[in-house]
Amino acid sequence: SIHHQILSSTGYQGTIENKKVLDSILSSLTNKKIDSSKTIVIIFHPGKDECNSSGSATAETRKIWFEELERKLFKITQTKPIYIYKEKEGTEKDDGILTWHKDPNRLIESLFFKYHYPCSSFVVISKTGEFKSYFGEITKEYIWSYAKSLQKK
């Protein structure tokens, strides 16, 4: 559960009580060990909507976009994002580019994304459990900026 939170029109920030439990759930979900001493970035796909099902991006431009996101994020956090969906529809365009995981029992949605925001959203969680989320269309620059600001916490 969350014991401190601030909600704004574009995001949500606070602290999760037990990050180790979240780390364990994410490790099980992804079949990869989540290092509790590192920052976590989750990109959340709410399901197909007008925003995330339109646009002119090709598979190649999406691949380049996500490779750049992951490369620079790794320099900041030594981790890569975890891609989680509520509804799988709309993630097919990333087949062969990203590995999406189903939100276990809607945990990620209930902790960080209580409402459906168009496009996709993200959350950055520090090693101490402090987090900042951003609702709606994501930019690499915002993810990097949030990761840098929480890296020191």
PLM regions: where:
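A short, hydrophobic beta-strand/beta-hairpin element that forms part of a small beta-sheet core
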Residues: 119-134
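Start-of-domain marker
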Residues: 1-23
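N-terminal targeting/trafficking signals and adjacent low-complexity tails
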Residues: 24, 36, 107-108
